[in-house]
């Protein structure tokens, strides 16, 4: 073979041949986005996560205006999100529970991650930090769209909860045809 070719099997009892390597394309629908600034979350209310900065979006299918991703190509997709949440106000700021949702076409598709932390003995004024992360494989058509929502409940409604910019991300890519 020559540079750029791979040895390909032609089946049992048939000699293999060298063919031009395939796969790997810059046109495969994919994106990765993150928060552009810390995002305050209302206590005990589902909140859409505003992923306003994109690392990349092949085909321009991620909207930093609507904070949603539309694949644009039918197929099976790996979809993943990670949220890093911080609270303050000591015991009152400790997470009672939290959930991260994947919405498809404006409705909840699944709970990607659930959080039920334990009382970690924080004192007043200390910060609690928790991570929600999850992934799913879903079949999408060309016009489906996906969004991430988060629900966080602290012990009292007075505690503030913010999503951190550094590790809070939303990403997806095509893994195969429908």
Show where each model-derived region lies.
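Short, surface-exposed tryptophan/glycine-enriched loops
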Residues: 121-145
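Extracellular repetitive beta-rich solenoid segments
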Residues: 1-28, 65, 73, 94, ...
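Short, acidic Gly/Pro/Ser/Thr-rich loop/turn segments
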Residues: 14, 40, 86
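Beta-rich globular "head" domains
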Residues: 32-35, 53-108, 135, 146-149, ...
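Short proline/glycine-enriched turn/loop segments at secondary-structure junctions
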Residues: 158-163
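Predominantly extracellular/luminal regions of secreted and cell-surface proteins
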Residues: 25-52
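Solvent-exposed serine/threonine-rich low-complexity stretches and specific carbohydrate-binding patches
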Residues: 110-123
């Amino acid at each position: 073979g020559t540079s750029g070719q791979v040895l390909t099997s032609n089946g049992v009892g048939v000699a293999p041949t060298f063919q031009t390597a395939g796969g790997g394309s810059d046109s495969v629908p994919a994106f990765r986005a993150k928060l552009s600034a810390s995002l305050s979350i209302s206590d005990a209310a589902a909140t859409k996560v505003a992923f306003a900065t994109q690392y990349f979006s092949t085909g321009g299918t991620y909207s930093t205006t609507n904070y949603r991703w539309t694949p644009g190509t039918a197929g099976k997709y790996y979809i993943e999100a990670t949220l890093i949440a911080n609270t303050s106000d000591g015991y009152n700021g400790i997470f009672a529970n939290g959930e991260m949702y994947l919405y498809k076409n404006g409705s909840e598709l699944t709970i990607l991650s659930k959080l039920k932390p334990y009382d970690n003995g924080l004192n007043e004024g200390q910060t609690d930090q928790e991570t929600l992360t999850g992934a799913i494989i879903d079949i999408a058509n060309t016009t489906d769209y996906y969004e991430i929502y988060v629900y966080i409940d602290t012990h009292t409604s007075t505690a503030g909860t913010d999503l951190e910019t550094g590790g809070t991300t939303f990403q997806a890519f095509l893994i195969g045809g429908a």
